[in-house]
Design a protein with these regions (language model features):
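Extreme N-terminal starter segment of soluble prokaryotic enzymes
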Residues: 1-5
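Short beta->alpha junction loops
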Residues: 46-56
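Short, glycine-/small-residue-rich phosphate/pyrophosphate-handling segment
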Residues: 49, 107-150
Length: 150
């Protein structure tokens, strides 16, 4: 069985590799996407990637996921801590959701410790660097498989 997974990235992630590499690493978003594609092939999954610095774009992609995606992997970035609108959009999605953060948001500034998205996420992966995306893909295919067999 093949699964379609939306991978949604929020603000400033288009600058991976340039923005605070000591915190986020040296890989670009395109590098991350290439690595994810390789992982997805091993697990018979297809990916659709989205990135925007605009909250409304992320919401539109979450809405679109309802029509075709088996699961959503989302790194809402700074919107994690501020966006009830993204939480509300995710609440409408009926499949599994994995929230990914490159850094461990719980060891950073206090305002980053709370994520609205976590309230709806099936799982949260944080602090593994960009490898967190590949972990999320592996776990998402497990979750999608469990839903199909139950």
């Amino acid at each position: 069985m093949s699964y379609l997974i939306y991978v949604i990235n929020g603000p400033n992630l288009n600058l991976l590799g340039q923005r605070e590499p000591e915190l986020y690493g040296g890989k670009t978003l395109r590098d991350v996407e290439k690595s994810c594609i390789e992982t997805a092939k091993k697990y018979n999954a297809k990916l659709k990637f989205f990135q925007s610095n605009a909250e409304h774009d992320l919401i539109d992609w979450i809405h679109a996921s309802r029509e075709e995606a088996n699961g959503v992997i989302i790194n809402p970035a700074a919107f994690s801590h501020t966006s009830v609108a993204i939480l509300d959009a995710l609440t409408l999605f009926e499949g599994p959701i994995i929230e990914v953060h490159i850094s461990n948001i719980h060891t950073r500034e206090n305002f980053r410790h709370h994520s609205y998205v976590s309230q709806k996420a099936t799982a949260v992966i944080a602090g593994f660097g960009t490898e967190g995306y590949n972990i999320a893909i592996r776990k998402m295919t497990d979750l999608c498989g469990q839903l199909k067999t139950s």
